[in-house]
Structure formats: structure tokens, C-alpha cells
Amino acid sequence: MERSGPIAALAAAFFFNFLAGVYVNHVGRSLPSLDADLLLGALPRVDLTGFFVWGFAAFAVFVIAAGLTTERMRIPYIAWMYALLISTRALFIVLTPMGAPKGAFAVEGYSLFEIFGRFLTFKNDLFFSAHTSMPFLGFLIFRRAWVRIVFFAFSLSLAATVLLSRLHYSIDVAAAFFITCGVVWIHRELVEPPYRRWRARWLEGKSA
């Protein structure tokens, strides 16, 4: 149960994310783009959609491989943290639907996106950036120094990708770092302590 529970929570989070993405895509069609983004106005427009798709796929492969090889005993915890982050983001994108930035490049057409990506990412699921926050969560919760460096590099490079390709506003990227830190803090300070106390009492009762 301790291993299957977080995996089930992660699957439920992805389903919640899918429903939220479908909703904001429907609502976002009629919403205007935000014009007053100073950073986007200063950055060049560059088509990095290939890295948007394949770079995130490389991150997904890396997080699974790193978990299995360096954090095998903590896989339930890692799965639970990603479930918490994905669920938090799904809630945020429903609360803050926005029109996509002007000049956003289309990511449709890539084989990987058509098979998997279209169920995970949507044109109007903007606040906050999953391409930034999910690698950054790996940086925060994994323990090996070299693994954390790789995650941080993924986070920064994908953050640059979504900005240059006009797939996110700058606030989506900036907020991703702060919200991810908040999710980790909330779990550590508010969720984990009562869970540990409950689990200790449950184990005592079971052994009695």
C-alpha cells in the first residue's frame, strides 16, 4: 500500500491535469493574449518547439532513471511529490485561464507530442509552467549532487525554451520556481509531520 498509494496518486494527478487542460483550452480560445509582458517584449522569438517536446521527454526519462538508480527506496516519496505538484498546477491553471502569448509557436506535428504530449500539455495551460517546475522539483527533492545539477539545467533550459518560443508568459516561469518551493515546504511542514504521527500510531496498534 505504501508503494502503490503514491503511484495511484500520481496517476490521478495526471488525469486531473488532463481534465484541467481540456477545460482551459476550451475557455482560453475566447480570451485575449496579455500584451504587457516586458521580458517577452525584450526577448527574440525563436522556434525551440523541438526542444520543448524532446527536451521534456529527456527530462521524463531522466527522472525515472535517476529514481530507479539513485533513490529506489524513496520512489514512493518522489511519486507523491510529483502528484502534489501536478495537482497544484492543475488547480492553478483552472483558476487562472489565459490566452496564449502572441506569436506562440505550434507544437503540434511532432510524433511524440501527437502520441503522448497532447494528453499532458495544452495551449492554454499557462500558469504556472510545468516545463520549469517539474525539473526544479527534481532539483529540490533528489539528493545526489550531480543529479540535482542535471535537474537544474533541465529547468533553466526548458524555462528559456518556453519563453523564447512564446509558449509561456514570464510570470508563468518565474512563479514556477516559487510555487514549487512552496509545495515542498507545505509537504515538509504541514503534511508529513501529522502523517508520520498517524503512521506511528497505526503501526503501534497493528503490532499490539
State the predicted function of each range:
Residues 125-127, 157-185:
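Interfacial helix-loop-helix junctions of multi-pass membrane proteins
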Residues 52-59, 129, 133, 174-178:
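Membrane-embedded alpha-helical segments of multi-pass membrane proteins
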Residues 15-19, 86-92, 155-166:
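Aromatic-anchored segments of alpha-helical transmembrane domains
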Residues 1-60, 105, 203-207:
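N-terminal transmembrane-helix/juxtamembrane module of multi-pass inner/ER membrane proteins
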Residues 5-13, 76-84, 150-153, 171:
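Alpha-helical transmembrane segments of integral membrane proteins
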Residues 25-34, 38-39, 68-148, 155, ...:
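Membrane-interface loops
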Residues 139-143, 180-188:
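Hydrophobic transmembrane alpha-helices
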Residues 57-60, 83, 137-138, 152-155, ...:
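Residues within membrane-spanning alpha-helices of integral membrane proteins
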